[in-house]
Amino acid sequence: MHLKTFSNLLVFVATVAAHGYVDNVTVNGILYTGYQPNSDPYYATPPPRIIRPVQGNGPITDLTLIDLQCGGYTEGGIVGSQPANLTAGPVAAGSTVSLRWTLWPDSHSGPVITYMAKCPAAGCSTYVPGTAAVWFKIQATGRIGNTTVWGDTPLKTAGNSYSYTIPSCLSAGSYIVRHEILALHAAWTYPGVQFYPSCHQIQVTGSGTSTGPSSKVAIPGVYKATDPGIVYDMYAVQPYTIPGPAVFTC
């Protein structure tokens, strides 16, 4: 069997088998259960959640959809960035936040990228960024050299866990944190790359004064179909360029 054909078969099997979403988030020692797509929509009164609703464990494959922002499914009634009814924290700038994903398939290798966007003074519970350029990247891990180790490898080897650090210089306030995995197992053409975004809301404290970089990005809009990190053959031995802006540092 030809290698590419065999790869296609593996992709199909993996696609049928499983994907994933962020199941819970630990902020300042408190574990917050995330949005549960298989049960939360059926409650008369929605449970308190810090994670914005997602359509399930499936991917977003169209870079132009608002669903790319936070994993919604607009056609199915879940808008691209429907606010959560709870905000985690308070948590000090400079702290580390831990996320736990559901089961993640071995075949779905790719980078892990985290963005933040500051909410208005009224908080995040009614804030919908839309197509405004409000997002900045705070973390990104791609392919380690030309190895088979990727940003999402810890999800397969460390109990489906991942963490990020809130920039220590950020000003106090409420933020949306957008955490995503790009699965590249079918990304040798576009459409092909699979996006698994998840957004949660946190209240940050501290004496920092930064609001992130002066130039921010819109989501959707940050990625283009022609970007090197969007179209990529992960089965080839070659470097990988993480798409999007540079990581913000204090």
Swiss-Prot record:
UniProt binding sites for Cu(2+): H19, H108, Y196
Reactions listed under catalytic activity: [(1->4)-beta-D-glucosyl]n+m + reduced acceptor + O2 = 4-dehydro-beta-D-glucosyl-[(1->4)-beta-D-glucosyl]n-1 + [(1->4)-beta-D-glucosyl]m + acceptor + H2O
Domain of life: Eukaryota
Cofactor annotation comment: Binds 1 copper ion per subunit.
Biological process annotations from GO: cellulose catabolic process
Inducing factors: Expression is increased 8-fold in cellulose-inducible conditions (in Avicel- and wheat bran-containing complex medium).
Enzyme nomenclature, EC number: 1.14.99.56
Residues the record marks as carrying a glycan: N24, N85, N146
Cofactor entry: Cu(2+)
List of residues binding O2: H185, Q194
Keyword Disulfide bond tagged: yes
Signal peptide as annotated in the record: 1-18
Enzyme class, UniProt record, top EC level: oxidoreductase
Keyword rRNA-binding assigned: no
Biotechnology: Lignocellulose is the most abundant polymeric composite on Earth and is a recalcitrant but promising renewable substrate for industrial biotechnology applications. Together with cellobiose dehydrogenases (CDHs) an enzymatic system capable of oxidative cellulose cleavage is formed, which increases the efficiency of cellulases and put LPMOs at focus of biofuel research.
A Pfam family hit: AA9
MF terms (GO), sorted A to Z: metal ion binding; monooxygenase activity
Location relative to the cell: Secreted
Entry GO CC: extracellular region
Function: Lytic polysaccharide monooxygenase (LPMO) that depolymerizes crystalline and amorphous polysaccharides via the oxidation of scissile alpha- or beta-(1-4)-glycosidic bonds, yielding C1 and C4 oxidation products. Catalysis by LPMOs requires the reduction of the active-site copper from Cu(II) to Cu(I) by a reducing agent and H(2)O(2) or O(2) as a cosubstrate.
Family note: Belongs to the polysaccharide monooxygenase AA9 family.
Name this protein carries in UniProt: AA9 family lytic polysaccharide monooxygenase F
UniProt organism field: Botryotinia fuckeliana (strain B05.10) (Noble rot fungus)
